[in-house]
Regions:
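A short glycine-leucine-enriched loop at secondary-structure breakpoints
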Residues: 76-80
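Extracytoplasmic
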Residues: 25-28, 56-59, 81-83
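Thiol-based oxidoreductase modules, predominantly thioredoxin-like and allied folds used
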Residues: 33, 56-72
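Non-catalytic, surface beta->alpha helical segment in thiol-disulfide oxidoreductase systems
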Residues: 82, 87-113
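The canonical Cys-X-X-Cys-His
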Residues: 38-42, 86
Length: 113
């Protein structure tokens, strides 16, 4: 649905475009697509916390529970086919990194260097 895709694209610009918002200091958004019943997704909870702790002033971390109705449009927009999937957006809200499966905080951190 083009209307849905446009509204998600607009939401991304409103929520995650930091380029013109100097007050935030944020440079990246880390979207973690997963579900509560998924073992690898649960392992990613620790990674999300590590990223928050290490890069909190520069990286906004957001968990997107694919089993919730309110994230279905986001899941479709990003074409999520398997979980967990990590997507990193730059400060313009553009996707710069994607990974499916478990990834360590150390490996993920290389994106933020």
């Amino acid at each position: 649905n083009e209307t849905t895709a446009a509204s998600i694209a607009d939401s991304i610009q409103i929520l995650y475009n930091y380029k013109d918002r100097r007050d935030t200091g944020l440079q990246y958004t880390f979207l973690e697509f997963g579900a509560m019943g998924c073992i690898s997704c649960r392992k990613m909870e620790r990674v999300m916390e590590d990223i928050r702790t290490t890069y909190g002033k520069r990286v906004k971390v957001r968990f997107m529970n694919v089993s919730k109705q309110e994230t279905q449009e986001w899941t479709k927009y990003f074409g999520i086919a398997a979980i967990p999937t990590q997507i990193i957006l730059d400060n313009n809200g553009h996707e710069i990194f994607r990974h499916t499966g478990f990834i360590s905080a150390e490996d993920l951190g290389t994106v933020f260097k």
